[in-house]
Regions:
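Low-complexity/repetitive intrinsically disordered segments
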Residues: 1-2
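Signature of N-terminal electron-transfer/Fe-S-associated modules in redox systems
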Residues: 5-10, 21-167
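Charged/polar low-complexity intrinsically disordered segments
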Residues: 16-19
Length: 167
């Protein structure tokens, strides 16, 4: 038992506190991934790997671990790894998410993380979907600033007055 003045230490990330204060640290987990190769498969299936867990590991890092250590045929997209570009958008354990942002510990269902491609999009291979319609709509919407004036030779600086208007 604890002596007066002593406290239970906080469990490490990836640790689970069981009954009686016993701590179990996660060393590995199962990654269940949607697989489909139109050149080989009549229909999709799921494949599961046991992955070595590391504190703070993201789902993207788990996919890269599988690609590098277990199966270099696994297909998925990623780019910035900073939750900005959206390239690694997937359906992770029942929710839409960016694989580079979601930590494994937050996506676990029991001891398993399930990863599927975005629904309602044609699957090219595994987790890679056809984004043609998305990019067509993106270009149609033009989600960028359109300038009526020619570009200046120097950058445009925001005045303190302009800045104050936006605060």
């Amino acid at each position: 038992g604890l002596q007066p003045g002593h406290h239970h230490p906080l469990p490490a990330a990836g640790a689970e506190v069981l009954e009686g204060g016993v701590t179990r640290v996660m060393k590995e987990f199962k990654l269940r991934v949607f697989r489909y190769d139109p050149e080989k498969d009549a229909q999709h299936h799921y494949q599961t790997w046991t992955v070595d867990y590391r504190e703070g590991m993201t789902v993207l890092e788990a996919l890269l671990w599988v690609f590098e250590k277990k199966d270099p045929s696994l297909a998925f997209r990623y780019s910035c790894r900073e939750a900005i570009c959206g390239s690694c958008a997937m359906y992770i354990s029942g929710r839409y998410a960016l694989a580079c942002k979601v930590q494994v510990k937050d996506a676990l269902e029991g001891d398993t993380v399930t990863v599927s491609p975005l629904p309602h999009m044609r699957v090219i291979k595994d987790l890679v979907v056809d984004q043609t319609k998305f990019w067509e709509n993106y270009a149609r919407v033009k989600p960028w600033l359109i300038n009526d004036d020619p570009a200046p030779e120097r950058e445009r600086l925001q005045s303190p007055e302009d800045r104050a208007r936006y605060n």
